[in-house]
């Protein structure tokens, strides 16, 4: 299939770019105020305050990362219009505390605010991260309820 402007190919590219921008802005804002570890092989030199931890094996290391992190962040690809991202299930299944962007299906299967937390925009994400980092018992209670 050939690439043509104005087709689904272009829309997908745009959505991926938007997701990358949202992730960058979130990490830049959060790392300016909090200690942020990122498990990724892609290092963005602009994110000077982010602590890159490299690749984490999905089966052996990621469950430990999810369960031991004070906050796990999910920013879904904009191409995921419906459904619950696997990362949400992974984090909750490991007993981790999750802040995620809102996906409509989440409210069908999860008790938002009691099993996980969702944010509306980058500013809301920052405020919720700030709140839950200073409310340890509430954060732990939500993490346990999500299992």
Predicted features and spans:
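Short acidic active-site motifs
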Residues: 60-61, 124-127
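Amphipathic alpha-helical segments within well-ordered protein domains
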Residues: 129-130, 147
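Catalytic phosphate/metal-binding cores of nucleic-acid and nucleotide-processing enzymes, i.e., regions
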Residues: 122-125, 146
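Nucleotide-sugar donor-binding catalytic core of glycosyltransferases
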Residues: 1-85, 97-106, 112
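A short, well-ordered alpha-helix in the C-terminal region of glycosyltransferases
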Residues: 138-147
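Conserved acidic donor-binding segment of nucleotide-sugar-dependent glycosyltransferases
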Residues: 116-122, 132-136
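Short alpha-helix at the nucleotide-sugar/activated-sugar donor binding site of glycosyltransferases
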Residues: 90-92
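Mg2+-dependent phosphoryl-transfer enzymes with acidic/Ser/Thr/Gly-rich catalytic loops
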Residues: 101, 119, 140
